[in-house]
Regions:
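Active-site neighborhood of glycoside hydrolase catalytic domains
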Residues: 494-505
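Sec-dependent signal peptide recognition
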Residues: 2-9
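Aromatic-residue-lined binding/catalytic grooves and analogous aromatic/hydrophobic interfacial grooves
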Residues: 18-490, 504
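C-terminal motif of bacterial Sec signal peptides marking the signal peptidase cleavage site
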Residues: 14-15
């Protein structure tokens, strides 16, 4: 085992040559994504999208890494361990009565699940010129962080490029046909949040909404079986009776709490073209080239401030981001994006060699054959794909990578799409130093500093101790109490010394 560790370390260090790879590193496929898991991720460390690469209907599923349910006042803090209770649990454990100790801990020491990372919405692009596609290819070039879709339809060649720019904080989509007036498309937003509304203006399409003020993924039956109704005053009255028949509350259902969000989408014609914008969406026609600039913003204003009462105006922020990006043409936007991205990505070159036949295969076919056929170059590609995801998902000023990076389609995602800080968060950042991406750790270090603030309150109120403490899970609201109903996980503590481990591993 130690020999394997040495070999892995040698390979990682040998990869850091500082010379960029000669050939583009590309994941590619010969058909559109059939579901979210097959779509291609792009991101700029704050905004992200999953690109499906459709022909008749294209879809970009959108995320912004501050969009969460809840707010600071929704954080459950009513847990206090008395010295007598502490001594009793320790005594039971010393006596080997682990089940009794566990039951006591579940009843008195644990909080509840933290709040949830939320999807922003979807951008849909309808092709109004139907026809069978030929020569189809969609790809993600991780050498320059650009997703492309190319195909022919009715004898016309279409090319689509999408990227998420870190320097300009926008997502850019460029469409081109090789025939005059070849493009006829309609675009609109949707969102899983019932509060979201679409509005057209003279020059742009806007999506505005509010995330849920409270979400709970545990079922009513689980909560009641555990006797945890008192931990959920949003759902239960003082007598433990249900106030709602649902576990996701919006707006007036939760006293107006919840984070506001807004997206603004503007089309730009490098040459001629026609555009109609209404509340129903955007219609683009009579052109062979158009690009779109998409900005996204939320009312998040810090882990300790209410986004509904003390939040940033997402409309003003999204408009400001968009106006700055509009000062550049498409080629300049793309150049600024690729130069910024490659300043990080090109620090490492890692080449393993496979046959030309293997390299010519679509990536999904290569993965299918990998188990029984040596394909070293695919391993090198996946190594670089990991670095791509780090750069795309974690940049200074943003939030750390959560359990799904920055990409999530579900309002109640698996494990809350949170930060599991007893191991998974650390694992996300293990490659950062070894693969020469030190800057990408800044969001993690800032989260630790913020946890020390909420963690000092938990140390004082829960344990009657100085210093600070965090347990096994947190979110953008920097919860530091033990949460949920699983004591062997919930009580995984990250006090000051383990926080050094969290920082350095």
């Amino acid at each position: 085992m130690r020999t394997i560790s040495y070999l892995i370390s040698f390979l990682l260090l040998a990869a850091c040559t500082g010379t960029p790879s000669k050939a583009p590193l590309t994941l590619w496929y010969d058909k559109p994504a059939q579901n979210w898991d097959e779509a291609l991720p792009i991101g700029n460390g704050r905004a992200g999208a999953m690109v499906f690469g459709g022909v008749e209907k294209e879809q970009l599923q959108l995320n912004e890494n501050t969009l969460y349910s809840g707010e600071p006042s929704v954080v459950f803090k009513d847990v206090k361990i008395t010295p007598e209770m502490f001594d009793k649990v320790v005594g039971l454990m010393k006596a080997g009565k682990y089940k009794t100790a566990s039951d006591l801990v579940c009843k008195n020491w644990l909080g509840r699940l933290h709040q949830y990372y939320q999807p922003f919405g979807d951008l849909h692009i309808q092709n109004n010129k139907p026809g069978d596609a030929a020569g189809y290819k969609r790809a993600l070039n991780i050498s320059d962080a650009v997703a492309t879709t190319v195909y022919k339809q009715n004898g016309v060649k279409y090319e689509r490029e999408v990227f998420a720019s870190h320097p300009d904080n926008v997502i850019v989509m460029h469409l081109k046909s090789d025939t005059p007036n070849g493009i006829d498309i309609s675009l609109d937003f949707t969102s899983p949040h019932p509060t979201a509304q679409q509005k057209g203006t003279d020059d742009r399409l806007i999506l505005h909404g509010q995330a849920p003020g409270y979400v709970e993924r545990r079922t009513f039956e689980q909560i009641e079986q555990w006797g945890d109704q008192y931990k959920h005053p949003e759902l239960y009255d003082a007598n433990g009776k249900r106030k709602f028949d649902k576990r996701m509350l919006y707006g007036d259902e939760i006293g107006g709490k919840g984070m506001f969000f807004e997206a603004q989408l503007k089309p730009v014609f490098p040459k001629d073209g026609k555009c109609e914008i209404t509340d129903a969406g955007i219609h683009i026609y009579n052109t062979d080239e158009v690009y779109f600039i998409l900005s996204m913003a939320t009312s998040f204003n810090g882990f300790d401030k209410s986004p509904s009462r003390d939040g940033i105006d997402p409309s003003a922020k999204a408009a400001s981001i968009l106006e700055k990006a509009l000062s550049y043409d498409y080629q300049t936007l793309k150049q600024r994006h690729t130069e910024d991205y490659r300043s990080l990505f090109d620090r490492v070159d890692f080449e393993l060699f496979s046959s030309p036949e293997q390299k010519a295969m679509p990536t999904d076919k290569r993965l299918e054959q990998f188990a029984g056929n040596a394909d070293p170059d695919l391993a090198a590609l996946l190594f670089q794909f990991g670095r791509y995801l780090m750069i795309s998902g974690s940049r200074p000023g943003g939030q750390p990578l959560n359990l799904q990076g920055i990409w999530n389609k579900d309002t109640i995602p698996a494990w809350n799409c949170g930060y599991t800080i007893n191991i998974n968060t650390e694992m996300n950042y293990w490659p950062a130093e070894l693969t020469n991406l030190s800057e990408c750790q800044e969001p993690l270090f800032r989260m630790i500093r913020e946890l020390s603030v909420s963690g000092a309150e938990t140390a004082r109120n829960m344990y009657n101790r100085r210093g600070w403490v965090a347990h096994h899970n947190t979110s953008i609201w920097r919860e530091s109490l033990p949460n949920d109903n699983v004591p062997n996980a919930s009580l995984s503590q990250n006090t000051n010394n383990p926080a050094v481990y969290l920082s350095l591993n």
